[in-house]
């Protein structure tokens, strides 16, 4: 499973990139708004750091508007992926983008049927939202398993991005259940490194070494 980072913060992206684990970035209007910067300028900055997929979301709700926005976003850099909501109008736009060779990430996926529809429309990625499903008492991880099974049975090449990741357990379980990618907030990404026994082991090795000097 690959790691994307879910942020529009340049320092977070730079740090994750320096770690050598970053395969891409996902953004959304809310994340960009927090940064108080021009959307297009921030995308240019991100794509200058990251060579993998960078998801940029359209804000129009009709297919013609999404297509117009998406085509402009795609001009920013060749690794821009157009993020489109899981709606009938969104899938019309996905089909149009697919025919033009523009990559797409269908977001706000909450059912396997939605994921299948998005894949058949030509989506490069589908993004089921684990945390938001958990919030309403549904099993987001079970959804990952179901989508992965359906895609495997039918030879569908659309990749599954586990999104709305809340904690490290989501990452482990998404990997076990067949997600191709986890898009992870910076805070959770850093938590993946941590274990008290790792820290204790380092301290012991250093103490043992220093005693011999």
Swiss-Prot record:
Q: What is its EC number?
A: 2.2.1.2
Concerning its family, UniProt says: Belongs to the transaldolase family. Type 3B subfamily.
What is the predominant subcellular site recorded for this chain? Answer: cytoplasm
Instruction: Note the Pfam families from the entry.
Output: TAL_FSA
Q: Which gene encodes it?
A: tal
The cellular location(s) given in this protein's UniProt record come to: Cytoplasm
Q: Where is the active site?
A: 83
Which GO terms of the molecular function aspect are on file?
Answer: aldehyde-lyase activity; transaldolase activity
Entry keyword set: Cytoplasm, Pentose shunt, Schiff base, Transferase
Q: What highest taxon heads this organism's lineage? A: Bacteria
What top-tier enzyme class does this entry carry? transferase
Q: What's the source species for this entry?
A: Geobacillus thermodenitrificans (strain NG80-2)
Q: Which reaction does it catalyse?
A: D-sedoheptulose 7-phosphate + D-glyceraldehyde 3-phosphate = D-erythrose 4-phosphate + beta-D-fructose 6-phosphate
Return the protein name: Probable transaldolase
Pathway(s) per entry? Carbohydrate degradation; pentose phosphate pathway; D-glyceraldehyde 3-phosphate and beta-D-fructose 6-phosphate from D-ribose 5-phosphate and D-xylulose 5-phosphate (non-oxidative stage): step 2/3
Cross-referenced InterPro entries? Aldolase_TIM, TAL/FSA, Transaldolase_3B, Transaldolase_3B/F6P_aldolase, Transaldolase_AS, TSA/FSA_arc/bac
Q: Which GO terms describe its cellular component?
A: cytoplasm
Query: So what does this one do?
Result: Transaldolase is important for the balance of metabolites in the pentose-phosphate pathway.
- Single biological process term from Gene Ontology: carbohydrate metabolic process
């Amino acid at each position: 499973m690959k790691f994307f980072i879910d942020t529009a913060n340049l320092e977070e992206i730079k740090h994750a990139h320096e770690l050598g684990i970053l395969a891409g970035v996902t953004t959304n209007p809310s994340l960009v708004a927090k940064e108080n910067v021009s959307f297009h300028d921030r995308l240019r900055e991100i794509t200058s750091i990251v060579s993998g997929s960078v998801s940029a979301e359209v804000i129009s709700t009709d297919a013609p508007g999404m297509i117009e926005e998406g085509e402009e976003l795609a001009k920013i850099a060749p690794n821009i992926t157009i993020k489109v909501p899981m709606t009938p109008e969104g899938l019309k736009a996905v089909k149009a983008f697919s025919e033009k060779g523009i990559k797409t990430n269908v977001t706000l996926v909450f059912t396997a049927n939605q994921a299948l529809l998005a894949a058949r429309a030509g989506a490069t990625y589908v993004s089921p939202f684990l945390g938001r499903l958990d919030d309403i008492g549904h099993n987001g991880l079970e959804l990952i398993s179901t989508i992965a099974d359906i895609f495997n049975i039918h030879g569908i090449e659309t990749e599954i991005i586990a999104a709305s990741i809340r904690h490290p357990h989501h990452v482990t379980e998404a990997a076990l259940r067949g997600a191709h990618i986890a898009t992870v907030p910076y805070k959770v990404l850093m938590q993946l490194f941590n274990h008290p026994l790792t820290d204790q082991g380092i301290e012991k090795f250093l103490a043992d070494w220093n005693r011999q000097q």
